Structure formats: structure tokens, C-alpha cells
Amino acid sequence: MAFDQDWVPKTRLGKLVVEGQVASMDEAIKSGLPIREPQIIDMLLPDLEDEVLDINMVQRMTDSGRRVKFRATVIVGNRNGYVGLGQAKDVQVGPAIRKAIDAAKLNITYIRRGCGSWECACGLPHTVPYEVTGKAGSVSVTLIPAPRGLGIAAGNTATKVLEKAGIKDVWTKTFGTTRSTLNFAKATYDALNQVNVVRLPVYYGKEEI
């Protein structure tokens, strides 16, 4: 993603990034400072990719009549552990997508990966370390560790989210109305975040991201 050369940081973390005191995304997360400017992500993760998952027309009735807007849902990630999901609305499609990309950058998080399948003992971070479940609305998504080389056994929306997070092999189980792209993406993203809830023995006595 292109970095805005004219950016003037307004937050403490943004100033630290520009000054070079925070040089990586790991350091930014460990600092404990909130990420409130998308340009911070542009500087620290220059290889970040974005993809539009869904564009939908939404309507709202007001005193002056019916108001129509477009809602965009976007996933961003560097295919190496960092992933973010965002959505935004605007009267035009282009601005809605740009706002959703910025929202996804501000929601970016690090997903721990591992080799959690009993069928595989390669030790490489290619799948989830253990079974996790995420929910959004009526949709429930369960991610199950898979052996290396299997690929991503999931629906189209979930596959896009998992690929951006750097997950290469995984089994999935889904329940609910998965035709809802927004809830399907949110449930998958929530499942990825559940990986960070449990502290693994390998991290005992060490700093976690």
C-alpha cells in the first residue's frame, strides 16, 4: 500500500513511528498505545494487501425521505499473521471502500499460528495451533488444525480472510446463514482472534505479541 508522504501524525504512537523509535508492528503492539491513524499501519506494514469482501446497498427512512448508502466490507492482511476487518458506509462506492480499508487497518491484530494437527509434526506456522470457534449473528465458524499441504477447506469468504491472515491449511465447520457475507467474515475473524485468548506453554516466561 502506498504511504502518504504528507502525513503529519497527531497521536503519540504516530509521532514515535515517524521519529523511528517504533520501527515494527510488533513494537507498536507491545507499546500498549492505541493505533488511531491508518498511516501508522502503512509505514509499519508496507506489504499489506486489501480485498473487498462485500458491497451492499442500505437504506434508512428519515423525515426528509429515504436515504441510500453503500456499505463496504474489506479485509486487509500481510499473509504473515497480521489481519484486520473493517466496514464503512458512504453515499458512493469508492469513498465507502476507502473508509472500510482505513477501518480495517485500525482493527488490525496479530494472529498466532502453529502446527496443531495431530497428522502433522512439521513445526511450521501453517495452521491454527488448536481448534477455535467464532460467532457473529447466526453464523458460527470453527477452525480445526489441518496437516501441511491440505489447503484451506472453507467457503469463499472465509478463505479470503484466512489467506490474508497467513493461514495455509485448515479444516472448517460452519453453522447458520453463511450466505450473509458480513456475518460469515466477522465469524471467521472472531475465530482467528480466539487463538490469542489461550496462552500456550511455549510462551511461558516469554513476551507475547
Curated annotation (Swiss-Prot):
One of its GO terms (biological process) is translation. InterPro entries: Ribosomal_Su5_D2-typ_SF, Ribosomal_uS5, Ribosomal_uS5_arc, Ribosomal_uS5_C, Ribosomal_uS5_euk/arc, Ribosomal_uS5_N, Ribosomal_uS5_N_CS, Ribsml_uS5_D2-typ_fold_subgr. Keywords: Ribonucleoprotein, Ribosomal protein, RNA-binding, rRNA-binding. Residues 48-111 form the S5 DRBM domain. GO terms for molecular function: rRNA binding; structural constituent of ribosome. One of its GO terms (cellular component) is cytosolic small ribosomal subunit. It comes from the Archaea. Part of the 30S ribosomal subunit. Contacts protein S4. The N-terminal domain interacts with the head of the 30S subunit; the C-terminal domain interacts with the body and contacts protein S4. The interaction surface between S4 and S5 is involved in control of translational fidelity. Belongs to the universal ribosomal protein uS5 family. With S4 and S12 plays an important role in translational accuracy. This is Small ribosomal subunit protein uS5.
